[in-house]
Swiss-Prot record:
Location of the protein in the cell: Cytoplasm
Enzyme class: ligase
Similarity comment: family membership: Belongs to the FGAMS family.
Intrachain disulfide bonds: none
Name of the featured protein: Phosphoribosylformylglycinamidine synthase subunit PurL
A GO CC term attached to the entry: cytoplasm
Primary subcellular site in the record, as a coarse category: cytoplasm
Active site per database record: 54, 105
Quaternary organization: Monomer. Part of the FGAM synthase complex composed of 1 PurL, 1 PurQ and 2 PurS subunits.
Length: 754
C-alpha cells in the first residue's frame, strides 16, 4: 500500500524504521514536529539522506562558519560565488571567471574502487557544469594503505583505473595531484577529486527555482537503483575492523560518455539563455536537487515523480527520490523556452522530461500517480537540519606524541651514509616516481595544458589571444596535522600556495576537503576544529578566500581513525603562460642554483623519520605565512622579468629530493656546493617550510640576488647546473648518476602494483 500524506496523517502510531535509515530518536521527533504528523515512508527517506552527515554538515556546520567570519570584504572582492553554491567562482580578469572545487568519494571507493573513483570524478565535474562553466581539468588527492598491504593493490588498481577511465573519456586533462601511502588508510582510502571550469562572467548560473509556473526539467541518464543511499549513507558511517560495511547501499555506476554529451548539451542550453536555475544530481539525488532548488528560490515546487524516466521496474517513490544514478541534471525553465530546451536535448540525444513546476506557495509537494507522498517545507529538508555542537577535547595522548622528538634518531654523517639516505628515501613508496599512476591519465588532451608532468602545480591556458592562464595545486599532510592540527592545516595551505607561486602564477583563492575520523570522538573534533581555524586564519593572513569545500567524516576502521587529512587546493592566475616557470633544470646553459628561505633543523613528522625509523612524533615545521607571501611576490616578479629559468618548492624529502626531481625533469646533472659551516644532513633533508629551489640564468644572478636582498628574502647560492654531467654531485660528499636515480625512483610502484 502506498504511504500517502493523507494515510500518514491518519496513522500516527505506525512504526517506522528511522533508526535503520541513520536518524536519531530526537531527529525523528523533530521531523514529526515540523510536519505535525508522522512522515510518509518517502518523506522519511528524504529527510534521512538530506540530514545525513554527508549532506547536512550537521557536525561541522557550526565550525565552518569561522571561514565566513575571517573573510574580509577585500578577500571577497573577486568572488562571484562562494560557500553554499555547487562550487566557488572567482573573477580572474578580462571578463573571465574560474570555478573550482574538491570533493571526497572515500567510502564508495573502498567498497567498489573503480566505480567509486569514477563517479567521484563525474560528480565533481557536474558541480562545475552547474555553475555555467566548461570543465577544463581535473586533479586528484589519493591516500592508500601501506604499499605492501594485500588490499592496497585491489583498491589502488581500481581507483586509478576509475579516475583515468572517466576523466580520459570526458577529454579532461589530469594536471596533477598527490598519492600517499600510510597504514592508517588501509580499509579507508581517501579519493578526493578536484575539477576546474572556465566561463565568461555573464554565463554564471546558480541553483535556485523562482517564478511561479516555471517548469522543472530532469535531463540526462535514466534513474535506476544504483547508489540508493550511496554516498549520503556510506559517507556518514564507518567500516568495521574487518573492512566490511555496516550498511550495504549500492555504489553508483558511471557512464562518462553520457556525461561528455551532457556537458556539451548544458553549454548549448546556457548559450541559448534557456536556463533560469540548475542543480546537478549527486548525493541524495532528486531529494537534494528538488529541496535545494526550492529552498533557494522564492516559491514552492510540485513534482510528478512518476514522470521520472526509470531504468528499473517497480521502483518505489522513495527509491526514485533517493537514487544516486549518475549523469543527471535538474533545470528550472520558463514555459516559453521548454520546447527549445527539449529540442537542444534531442539534438544531443539527451533524455529530458518535464517533471514539475515552481509554485507560488512555500511547500515542496511530490506526487506519485496522482497521490501526494511528500508535502514538506523545503528549507527544513535542505538547510534546516540538525546542527550539533559535538564535544571537543584535546586527546590525552597529544602531549606524549609531541614530546617524542625525532632528535633521538641516529643521523647519517658521512658521504656514503648521506648517499644511502638519499636513495632510501627516493626508493621508498613515499617519494618514488608516480609515473606508474600518472601515465594512466591523459595530461595534455584539449591542448591547453602548459604544466603537468614533473610540475609542482598544474597550469592551463585559458585565453589563446592573450595567453592568460591559471595554475592549480592541491596538498595535504596527515602526519603534520596529527602532530599539530592548526599548524598542519596551515602547512598544507602554505605548500599548495607555494606550489602555485613557483609556476609564476599569483595565488587568488582556496578550496578544501577536510577528511577526518568520527565526529562522535571528541579527540577527532578537536583535530577538526583546530584544522578549520588554522586554515581560516592562514587564508586571512595570505589574503585569499576559501570559496567552498567539503567535509568527510567517519574515515576510520573500527575505532582507528585515519590521520587527520585536510586537503587544500589553491588557484592562481598568470597573465601570460609563456612566462611560466618550469621545474626541470637545464633550460639555460650554466644556470646558478639558489635556495630561497631559511633552513632549520626540522625533522619531526618528516619522510626521513618515517622511512628510516617508522617514527611519528614531535612538532611540525614552523609556518611563516608572511614569508610565503614574500616568496610568491618574488617569484611572480622573477617570472615576469625572466630572472628565473626553473623553480621547485621544498617539502617532503627537503632540498635533496627537490634537486633530484628537478635534475631528472631536465635530464641534466648538477653540482651542489654546500655553504661553509652548514650541516649537510640538515641542509639536504630538513623539511622546513617556506623554501624554494631556483635556477637562475648566469647573466641574471646578480640582478636576482639584488631583488631578494631588497625584499629581505634569504637567497643562498648552492651550486650550478652542469649540462655536461649525468650525475647529481654534492661536492666533497657523494655523487649519484641520473640513471641510478631514475631507476631507483621508477622501479618502486611497478614492484608493488605492476
Amino acid at each position: 500500500m502506498l504511504d500517502t500524506v493523507e494515510h500518514a496523517a491518519t496513522t500516527p502510531d505506525q512504526p517506522q524504521p528511522y533508526g535503520e535509515l541513520g536518524l536519531k530518536d530526537d531527529e525523528y521527533r523533530r521531523i514529526r514536529q515540523i510536519l505535525g504528523r508522522r512522515p510518509t515512508d518517502t518523506e522519511l527517506a528524504m529527510y534521512s539522506v538530506m540530514w545525513s552527515e554527508h549532506c547536512s554538515y550537521k557536525s561541522s556546520k557550526v565550525h565552518l562558519r569561522y571561514f565566513g567570519e575571517t573573510t574580509s570584504d577585500e578577500m571577497r572582492a573577486a568572488m562571484l560565488a562562494g560557500i553554499g553554491e555547487n562550487a566557488g567562482v572567482v573573477d580572474i580578469g578580462d571578463g573571465w571567471a574560474v570555478t573550482f572545487k574538491v570533493e571526497s568519494h572515500n567510502h564508495p571507493s573502498y567498497v567498489e574502487p573503480y566505480q567509486g573513483a569514477a563517479t567521484g570524478v563525474g560528480g565533481i565535474v557536474r558541480d562545475i557544469m552547474a555553475m555555467g562553466a566548461r570543465p577544463v581539468a581535473v586533479m586528484d588527492q589519493l591516500r592508500f594503505g601501506a604499499a605492501d598491504a594485500p588490499d592496497t593493490r585491489r583498491v589502488l588498481d581500481g581507483v586509478v583505473r576509475g579516475i583515468g577511465g572517466y576523466g580520459n573519456s570526458l577529454g579532461l586533462p589530469n594536471i596533477g595531484g598527490e598519492t600517499v601511502f600510510d597504514p592508517c588508510y588501509a580499509g579507508n582510502p581517501l579519493v578526493n577529486a578536484l575539477c576546474v571550469g572556465v566561463l565568461r562572467q555573464e554565463d554564471l548560473h546558480l541553483a535556485f527555482a523562482s517564478g511561479a509556473g516555471n517548469k522543472i526539467i530532469l535531463f540526462g541518464a535514466r534513474t535506476g537503483l544504483d547508489g540508493i543511499g550511496g554516498v549520503s549513507v556510506l559517507a556518514s558511517d564507518t567500516f568495521d575492523a574487518e573492512g566490511s560495511r555496516k550498511k550495504l547501499p549500492s555504489v553508483q555506476v558511471g557512464d562518462p560518455f553520457m556525461e561528455k554529451v551532457l556537458i556539451e548539451c548544458c553549454l548549448e542550453l546556457y548559450a541559448g539563455g534557456l536556463v533560469i536555475g540548475i542543480q546537478d544530481l549527486g548525493g541524495a539525488g532528486l531529494s537534494c536537487a528538488t529541496s535545494e532548488l526550492a529552498s533557494a528560490g522564492d516559491g514552492g515546487m510540485t513534482i510528478q515523480l512518476d514522470s521520472v524516466p526509470l531504468r528499473a521496474k517497480e521502483m518505489t517513490p522513495a527509491e526514485v527520490l533517493c537514487s544516486e544514478s549518475q549523469e543527471r541534471m535538474c533545470a528550472v525553465v520558463s514555459p516559453k523556452n521548454v520546447d527549445a530546451f527539449l529540442a537542444v536535448c534531442r539534438k544531443w540525444e539527451v533524455l529530458a522530461t518535464v517533471i514539475g513546476e515552481v509554485t507560488d506557495g512555500d511547500r515542496l509537494q511530490i506526487t506519485w500517480h496522482g497521490e501526494t507522498v511528500v508535502d514538506v517545507p523545503p528549507r527544513t529538508v535542505a538547510h534546516e537540519g540538525p546542527v550539533y555542537q559535538r564535544p571537543v577535547a584535546r586527546p590525552d595522548t597529544q602531549d606524549a606524541l609531541n614530546a617524542d622528538r625525532s632528535a633521538k634518531l641516529s643521523r647519517p654523517v658521512t658521504g656514503d651514509e648521506l648517499r644511502a639516505t638519499l636513495l632510501a628515501l627516493l626508493g621508498s613508496p613515499h617519494l618514488c616516481s608516480r609515473a606508474f599512476i600518472t601515465e594512466q591519465y591523459d595530461r595534455y588532451v584539449r591542448g591547453n595544458t602548459v604544466l603537468a608532468e614533473h610540475a609542482d602545480g598544474g597550469m592551463l591556458r585559458i585565453d589563446e589571444s592573450t595567453g592568460r592562464g591559471i595554475a592549480v595545486s592541491t596538498d595535504a599532510s596527515g602526519r603534520y596535522t596529527l602532530l599539530d592540527p592548526y599548524a598542519g592545516a596551515q602547512l598544507a595551505l602554505a605548500e599548495a600556495y607555494r606550489n602555485v607561486a613557483v609556476t609564476g602564477a599569483t595565488p587568488v583563492a582556496v578550496t578544501n576537503c577536510l577528511n577526518f575520523g568520527s565526529p562522535e570522538d571528541p579527540g577527532v573534533m578537536w583535530q577538526f576544529t583546530q584544522a578549520v581555524r588554522g586554515l581560516a586564519d592562514g587564508c586571512a593572513d595570505l589574503g585569499i578566500p576559501v570559496t567552498g569545500g567539503n567535509v568527510s567524516f567517519y574515515n576510520q576502521t573500527g575505532s582507528a581513525a585515519i590521520l587527520p587529512t585536510p586537503v587544500v587546493g589553491v588557484l592562481g592566475v598568470i597573465d601570460d603562460v609563456r612566462r611560466r616557470i618550469p621545474t626541470g633544470l637545464g633550460a639555460e646553459p650554466g644556470e646558478t642554483l639558489m635556495l630561497l628561505g631559511d633552513t632549520r633543523d626540522e625533522f619531526d613528522g618528516s619522510v626521513w623519520a618515517q622511512v628510516t625509523a617508522d617514527h611519528l612524533g614531535g612538532l611540525p615545521p614552523v609556518v611563516d605565512l608572511a614569508r610565503e607571501k614574500l616568496l610568491a611576490a618574488v617569484l611572480s616578479s622573477a617570472s615576469r622579468d625572466g630572472l628565473v629559468s626553473a623553480a621547485h618548492d621544498l617539502s617532503e624529502g627537503g632540498l635533496a629530493q627537490a634537486i633530484v626531481e628537478s635534475a631528472l625533469a631536465g635530464e641534466t646533472g648538477c653540482r651542489i656546493v654546500l655553504p661553509e659551516g652548514a650541516d649537510p644532513f640538515v641542509l639536504l633533508f630538513s623539511e622546513s617550510a617556506g623554501r624554494v629551489l631556483v635556477a637562475v640564468p648566469r647573466t641574471e644572478e646578480s640582478r636576482f640576488r639584488g631583488m631578494c636582498e631588497a625584499r629581505g628574502l634569504p637567497a643562498v647560492r648552492i651550486g650550478v647546473v652542469d649540462q655536461g654531467s649525468d650525475a647529481v654531485e654534492v661536492q666533497g660528499l657523494f655523487a649519484v648518476s641520473l640513471a641510478e636515480l631514475r631507476a631507483t625512483s621508477e622501479a618502486v610502484l611497478p614492484r608493488y602494483f605492476g
